[in-house]
Amino acid sequence: MKKVIVTGGTGFVAGWVIVEFLKAGYEVSTSVRSMKKTDRLEKEIAGAVSKEEMGNLSFFEADLTSDKNWVENIKGADGVIHVASPMGNGTQSVEELVTVAKNGTLTVLNAAKKAGVKRVVMTSSQAASTPESNSTETLDESFWTDINNPDLDPYRISKVESERAAWKFAEENDLELTTILPGAIFGPILSDKAVSSNGVLLRLLNGMPMTPHVPLEISDVRDLAHLHRLAFENPQAIGKRYLAASQTLTMAEIEKVYQTNFPYKKIKIRQAPNWTLKIAARFVPELRALVPMLDRKYHHTTVAAENDLGWTQHKPEDTVLDAAKMLIKLGVDK
């Protein structure tokens, strides 16, 4: 049985990556910052896999800010799926967040090298492949974000710098690296404690007074987890970046999906002037990342993942609907 290490097990994406690999017959060991969090994580994962598959999951305590416990726990694995990354809280400086993100990535990659594990699949972000907001381009994996772009927030800059650092380290140390670049990650949550990026959908589901014109390139978390496994298993993916979102819905279009499927919510769709989002983003952290996306016209292509790996995606309408159904089922929408 092959074994993979998944970093940041308590995260929204990492949880689904764990489920994906367990269901495919892998042994999975995942890092958590505190072993006190394993009870909750076990319950989340157990709800999505069989009892037999659950027996192949283990945990170890490790933090991206420290070298402690990484090497000995990675040793003997067939590969590392590096998902963990700091999101930031909107208050850090560029330097602070970039340093934490880069150092965390290099901590894991250096531990993999010392443990003799060459294969690494890393979660990056479309933030590392973003043009200026007025661009109308169709972008593929060859495009890298210009960190001098004034539209970029510290989080986006940190994703660019940490991915570049990963590629540099991989080239210098003969690691077999693949990076995955998702867009706005939505989909069913595994528990009411893991809302994560679905917080945006929760606001739309509960009705926003006005909706900014923000087109979102959507990555279904289930498809994203599947892409990590496909990339890990396919030697053709070594040395490549893969974009993981190409289908777009505006926030108003998401509201329309909810208006149709949940009429009792009495959702009203009102377009907001751009300046209202800019003001609201000062007080609501999850809205800050949306400001550079106002009225954007550029988009990405996922042809590489489709052609190389046979990857497919849910329709974005199904993604946001499935996410909402789970939010409602778990009572998070109240």
Task: Label every model-predicted segment.
Residues V4-Y26, S31:
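N-terminal Rossmann NAD(P)H-binding glycine-rich loop of SDR-like oxidoreductase domains
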Residues A46-N103:
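NAD(P)H-binding glycine-rich loop region in Rossmannoid oxidoreductase-like domains
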Residues T91-P154:
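Conserved Rossmann-fold NAD(P)-dependent oxidoreductase catalytic core, especially the SDR/UDP-sugar
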Residues P150-L177:
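Active-site Tyr-X1-5-Lys
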Residues E172-L175, G187-N198, L230-R241:
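Glycine/proline-rich active-site loop of Rossmann-fold NAD(P)-dependent oxidoreductases
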Residues L201-P209, V214-Y242, Q247:
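Alpha-helical substrate-binding/gating segment
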Residues L227-E286, P316-K334:
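Mid/C-terminal beta-alpha module of Rossmann-like enzyme folds, strongest
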Residues A280-T312:
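Conserved C-terminal active-site "lid" loop/helix of NAD(P)H-dependent oxidoreductases
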